[in-house]
Amino acid sequence: MKRHSLILLAVACALSLPSFGKGVNPPTMGWSTWNTFALNINEQVIKSQADAMVKTGLAKAGYKYVNIDDGYWDGRGEDGKLRLNTKLFPSGMRALTDYIHSLGLKAGIYSDAGDNTCGSGGVAKWGLGVGFVGHEKEDCELYFDDWNYDFIKVDYCGGNHAKLDEREQYTKISNAIKSCKKKGIVFNVCRWAYPGTWISDVADSWRTTGDIYCAWASVKSIVKENLYIQAYTGGGHYNDPDMLEIGRTLAPDEENTHMAYWCIASSPLLIGCDMTTIPEYSLNLLKNKDLIAMNQDRLGLGAPVVQREGEVYVVAKDMEKIFGKKRAVVVMNLTDEVKTINVDVNALGFTGAVLWYDCLIHADVYYGAGNYAVTIPAHGSKAFFVTGKRIEKTLYQAEEAWLKAYHELGKKRPTPQYLPNETADQGEYVGNLGYVDGMTDNYLEWRNVYSKKGGKYKMTIRYACGDQRSMNVSVNGTPVTTLTPLLSGDYLNKWNTVGVEITLKKGLNTIQLSNPAAPMPNLDCMKLTAAK
C-alpha cells in the first residue's frame, strides 16, 4: 500500500493537543496507606490518618485525599459481588467515606485491572478475583455510587496474570467510571511504566516507574527516569513518579530533592508516611506554600531539562502564564559531592536582570544580570521562582519532545527511544523514529514552540544516520517539505545539520518531524533563528 506521508502528517497534526496555557485540574494532593501500612490497614488507621491530615495543617495546605490501597477485601461472593473484610472495617465503607467527607476531605480506593491484587501475591484468598476484569461496571458502581469514593488507583498485577491488553482494559475501566452517577472521580493508572500516549485520554495520572522505596537510590532512580518524559504531562493529565517517602528515613537534603522535583514536574503529591508521627522538618517541607504553588500551578506543565553538567540538572517550566515573566526552576545535585553550577539565564529564557526567589527559605536571594552560581549539597536541590524579561526559546532538544508511539511497556512492542549519548548537545537524543517495526505513526512533535510575534524562521535540525534517510516537516498541521537525502556518516558519533525555512504563528506552535514510509535519522535538537 502506498503511504501518502504528507497527507498523514496533516491529519495527525489536526488531532487534539493538550490545552497549554489554559487553566486545568491540578495534580492530586493527599495521602495513601501503602508506604507505611502496606496490608496492615483497618478502619481506625484510616480515621486516625484523616484526623492527622486536618490537625497537622496538611489539609489546609491543600492535601485532601485519604486513599486506601490494597488489602480491604474478603474475596468475591458466589453472586459475583465484592465482599468487604468487616473485621477490618466493621462500620462499612460508606460510613468511612462519610467520616472522611465530614472532615472536608476526599476518599480514595484501590483495585486491579485484572483478577488478583498485588498484595494477594496470587495466593491469599481475600485478594483473588477481586480485580476489575469481568466486573468493571458493577465494581465502579459499588466504589463510587454506593461507597462514595472520589479517587481510585488501579494496579496491574492481576492484569499481567490474566494476560490483558493495557490499553483495552484501562479504557474499559475508564468508561465504566465515566458511566457512574458520581462525577469528578480521579483515575490513577498504576502500570509501573509509561503506558503510551493513549493514556492521556483514559486517566488523570499514570505511574511512570516501579514502586518507590525509602532510600536515596530509589528517589534518584525515579528522578532520572522521569527527566525526559515531561512532554507527556499536560492538559490536566500527569506523570506519576509514585508516592512521597518524605517523613520517614530520608535525610533533609534528600527530602528537599524529592519534594522539589515532584512539585516542579506537576506530579501527584501523595504522602506516604504516618501523619500522626511526622517529623517537624518533613511536615514543614510538605506544607511549603511555594513548592505547593509550583505543583498546583494553573498551567499544569511538565519541567524539561534546560541545562546539565554530569548529574547536576536544571529543570524549568512556565508559571501562571505561557511565556510570562515568572518561571519555576529546580537545580538538582544527584551526585554524592557538593557541586556548584553556573545556571545559564538565557537557557532559562531570560535576558537582562532577573530576580531569584528561593522557595525553600521563602526569600529573594539575588537580583542581577548574567548567570547565577548555585552551590548544592550532595543529594540536594534548590528551588526558585525566577522573574524577569523573557526571550524566545531558540533551542529545542529532541528529548523534550512528544513522541506519538512512545511507551515503556516492553513485551517486545516497538517504540521510539530516549537514549544517552555524550556527543549529543545535552547528552541525550531520540532514536528509532519513523517507519520502524511496522510503526507508521512514529513521529516527533515539539508542541510548545512559542513565537512572540509570529513570522519566518530558519529551523536547523541536528541529526545522525549512517545511511541515507529522510523526514517530513510540518508546522501546525501544514506540510512544509521533505528533507532528503540526509546523511552524517554514523548513527551515534557524527552529527550533521540541515536547515529549512518555516513560518510560525503568534503564540504556541507545533512542529512535527515524521516519516511513515522509512526510518528517520536519530535526532539531537533543533534551533530556531528568526528571519531578519
Please report, for each region that a protein language model flagged, where it lies by residue.
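Extracytoplasmic
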Residues: 339, 348-356, 367-532
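Carbohydrate-binding surface patches
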Residues: 262-265, 270-272, 308-350, 379, ...
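Aromatic- and carboxylate-lined catalytic core of secreted/periplasmic carbohydrate-active enzymes
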Residues: 234-235, 239-310, 380-381, 389-393
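Glycan-recognition surfaces
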Residues: 135-138, 168, 179, 185-274
